[in-house]
Amino acid sequence: MRIRHFATTAVAVGALAALSAVPAQATEYSSALKIKGIQYDAPGRDSNSCSTGNTDEEYLTIKNYSSSTTVNLKGYVVRDASSTNKFVFTANHYLQPGDYVKLRGGHGTDSDSGNVVYRDNCNFMWNNDKDTIKLYKPSGAGADLHSYTKSGSDPDGNGYITYHG
């Protein structure tokens, strides 16, 4: 009985040691598409003017991290923390494995070859101090989610944060 108790204790201690050696990880969604980075604070003074503003300098980079599957962005949704700012990819836009797209503010011509989609809206989507970026699959399931604060997530203060390399 004493040997059995010792063996059980040794196994439990070993399991705890193994668990403590694993680094803490954020919960990851099962999705090939991930938020690669965000230019949440456009360079210069913010201006929502469609003709002279800088909303096209605010962008979100979404990347297909699959090594074998092409993903169509049609139906994917991007939201901010309050969900008042929302963009739905309404057209077919295919991301080959390893490819990316920049979702920009303002107006322009969407281009698969240029890796850009415009929101056709001159309002800024992301807050300059803090916000949450939510990416949803067409089914409504989460694809990726990140929160940031200017002081905690952007130490060099350039308004750009990288999430997935």
PLM region spans:
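Extracellular beta-rich ligand/substrate-recognition surface
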Residues: 51-53, 78-84, 110-111
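The feature marks short-to-medium sequence segments in extracytoplasmic or secretory-pathway proteins
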Residues: 71-95
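Residue-level detector of beta-strand face positions
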Residues: 61, 77, 132-134
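A structural motif detector for short, solvent-exposed N-terminal "entry" segments of globular domains
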Residues: 2-11, 22-74, 124-128, 151-152, ...
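Solvent-exposed beta-edge/loop recognition patches
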Residues: 27-34, 45-47, 86, 91-165
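A mature extracytoplasmic/lumenal domain signature
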Residues: 39, 66, 75-77, 82, ...
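Conserved structured catalytic cores and adjacent interaction surfaces
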Residues: 15
